[in-house]
UniProtKB/Swiss-Prot annotation:
It is an enzyme of class 6 (ligase). GO terms for biological process: cysteinyl-tRNA aminoacylation; mycothiol biosynthetic process. Disulfide bonds: none annotated. Binds 1 zinc ion per subunit. A motif ('ERGGDP' region) lies at residues 185-190. InterPro entries: Cys-tRNA/MSH_ligase, Mycothiol_ligase_MshC, Rossmann-like_a/b/a_fold, tRNA-synt_1_cat_dom. This is L-cysteine:1D-myo-inositol 2-amino-2-deoxy-alpha-D-glucopyranoside ligase. GO terms for cellular component: cytosol. The lineage of its organism: Bacteria, Bacillati, Actinomycetota, Actinomycetes, Propionibacteriales. The gene is mshC. It comes from the Bacteria. Monomer. Catalyzes the ATP-dependent condensation of GlcN-Ins and L-cysteine to form L-Cys-GlcN-Ins. A motif ('KMSKS' region) lies at residues 287-291. L-cysteinyl-5'-AMP binds at C45, G46, I47, T48, T60, N83, I84, T85, W225, G247, S248, D249, V281.
Length: 406
C-alpha cells in the first residue's frame, strides 16, 4: 500500500547523540539500537481506518517520528514499518451503521490519514501495509504456531494458547485479574466457553454471515487482531526489532499477545528490544477515542485554518509518557510559540547556535524530553546574540529534529 509524501530532512552539523527510550517491559531507559551498527528497526501499530486522524493518533505518530529523526541524525539507516488494520470489527460496524461499503470507508479514511501525516511532516514508513493484503502472511504465521503446538480449535475458530510462551506477561507485568479485565475491554473474549485459558486470543475467525472472509487451510475466515501485527512485523523486520511502538492502550493485550505469537512462531526471544508507548490524549477529562465520539481531528483543525506546524508543536509540548487533555488553548499557545520562533529566525543574528542545537539534541535523546527541547529553543529565541550563523543553524535543527518548518 502506498504511504505518503516524505518531507525533506536536512542534515544538522555537529555531534549527534545516542537515543535512550523508556522500555515498558524493563521499566527503565534503554539505548536503542544497542550498538553503532544498523539498520535501526521500528514497528508502529497503525490506525483502524475510521474517524482518522484524532489528536491521540497524531501524538503517537509524531512521537515515533521523533525516534525516526533522531536515529537518522545519529547516522543510522532506519527501517520503519507501519500497518493499517483495514478489516476489523469496529470498521465493519461503522460501515454498516452508515450504509457505506467497508472497503470504501477504509480507503477514504486511509487517504485522510495520509494527508494529515503529510501536513504534520511525519516521515513515512518504508512499508505501509494493510491487513487485507497481508492475509497470506497471517496464514503462514498461524501455520507456524500450529506446528509449535500453540494453536487450538474452538467451534471452528482458532485460538493462540498464551501459556505456550513462558515470557507471556513480561511486557505489561500486569496481574491476572488486570489482564482479564483489559482483555475483555479491548476486544477479547475471556468468558468464551471452550477456551483453555480466558486470555487465549483469536488468531483465525471462521466466516460470519455478511462479513468479509478469505480462503485458508483453516477454512474461510479472517484473522484476529494481534496475529496481524505479528505477521507483518516478522515479514518486513524480523525478530528482535529495536522499537515496538504504539499507544499505551496497546500495552495489553495487543503488544503482549503479538509479541508472544511472534516468539512462539519463531522460537526466538525477544520480539523487541524496547516496547515504547505514547500516553493517552483526552478531551474534557476523558480519553479521546472513536468509541466515545469525543474527537478533535487534525483534518478539521487544518480545514479551520490552523497551521499544521502549530498542531505538531502543540503535541510536542507534552512529554510522550504523560497523559494530558486537549483544550483550545493548546493550539493558541503553540501558535504563539511558533510565531516567536519564526520571528527570532528572521532577525539575522542570535545567541550561540551550536550550543542551542546541542541542548536540543541532549533533551530529545533523553527519552524524547520534548518539554526540555522546546524550552531550549524558547530560551534561544528570547535571547539576543551576535552569532550571524545561529538563525540558519537553529532553523535547520528545529526542522530536522523536531520536524517543525519555521
Amino acid at each position: 500500500m502506498q504511504a505518503w509524501t516524505k518531507p525533506d530532512i536536512p542534515v544538522v552539523p555537529g555531534p549527534a547523540r545516542r537515543l535512550r527510550l523508556y522500555d515498558t517491559a524493563s521499566g527503565g531507559l534503554v539505548e536503542v539500537p544497542p550498538g553503532p551498527d544498523g539498520p535501526a528497526r521500528m514497528y508502529v501499530c497503525g490506525i483502524t481506518p475510521y474517524d482518522a486522524t484524532h489528536m491521540g493518533h497524531a501524538a503517537t505518530y509524531v512521537t515515533f517520528d521523533l525516534v525516526n529523526r533522531l536515529w537518522r541524525d545519529a547516522g543510522y539507516t532506519v527501517h520503519y514499518t507501519q500497518n493499517i488494520t483495514d478489516v476489523d470489527d469496529p470498521l465493519l460496524e461503522r460501515a454498516t451503521a452508515t450504509g457505506v461499503e467497508w472497503t470504501d470507508l477504509a480507503e477514504r479514511e486511509i487517504q485522510l490519514f495520509r494527508d494529515d501525516m503529510t501536513a504534520l511532516r511525519v516521515i513515512p514508513p518504508q512499508e505501509y501495509v494493510g491487513v487485507v493484503e497481508s492475509i497470506p502472511l497471517v496464514v503462514e504465521r498461524i501455520a507456524e504456531l500450529q506446528q509449535a503446538g500453540a494453536v487450538y480449535d474452538v467451534d471452528g475458530d482458532l485460538y493462540f494458547a498464551v501459556k505456550a510462551d513462558p515470557a507471556f506477561g513480561g511486557i505489561s507485568s500486569y496481574d491476572a485479574d488486570t489482564m482479564r479485565t483489559l482483555f475483555g475491554e479491548r476486544g477479547g473474549d475471556p468468558d468464551r466457553e471452550g477456551k483453555r485459558d480466558p486470555l487465549d486470543c483469536l488468531v483465525w475467525q471462521q466466516e460470519r454471515p455478511g462479513e468479509p472472509a478469505w480462503d485458508s487451510p483453516f477454512g474461510r475466515g479472517r484473522p484476529g487482531w494481534h496475529i496481524e501485527c505479528s505477521a507483518i512485523a516478522l515479514q518486513y523486520l524480523g525478530m528482535t526489532i529495536d522499537v515496538q511502538g504504539g499507544g499505551s492502550d496497546l500495552i495489553f493485550p495487543h503488544h503482549e499477545m503479538s509479541a508472544s505469537e511472534a516468539q512462539c512462531a519463531t522460537g526466538q526471544h525477544p520480539f523487541a528490544r524496547a516496547y515504547v508507548h505514547q500516553a493517552m490524549v483526552g478531551l474534557d477529562g476523558e480519553k479521546m477515542s472513536k468509541s466515545k465520539g469525543n474527537l478533535v481531528l487534525v483534518s478539521r483543525e487544518r480545514q479551520a485554518g490552523s497551521d499544521p506546524m502549530a498542531i505538531r508543536l502543540a503535541l510536542l509540548a507534552h512529554h510522550y509518557r504523560t497523559d494530558w487533555f486537549w483544550t483550545d488553548s493548546e493550539l493558541l499557545d503553540a501558535q504563539e510559540r511558533l510565531d516567536v520562533w519564526r520571528g527570532a529566525i528572521t532577525r539575522g543574528t542570535g545567541p550561540d547556535g551550536p550550543a542551542a542545537v546541542d541542548a536540543l539534541r541532549a533533551a530529545l535523546t533523553n527519552d524524547l524530553d520534548t518539554t526540555a527541547a522546546l524550552a531550549a529553543i524558547d530560551q534561544w529565541a528570547e535571547t539576543n546574540g551576535d552569532d550571524p550563523e545561529a538563525s540558519a543553524l537553529v532553523a535547520l535543527a528545529v526542522d530536522a529534529l523536531l520536524g517543525i518548518k519555521l
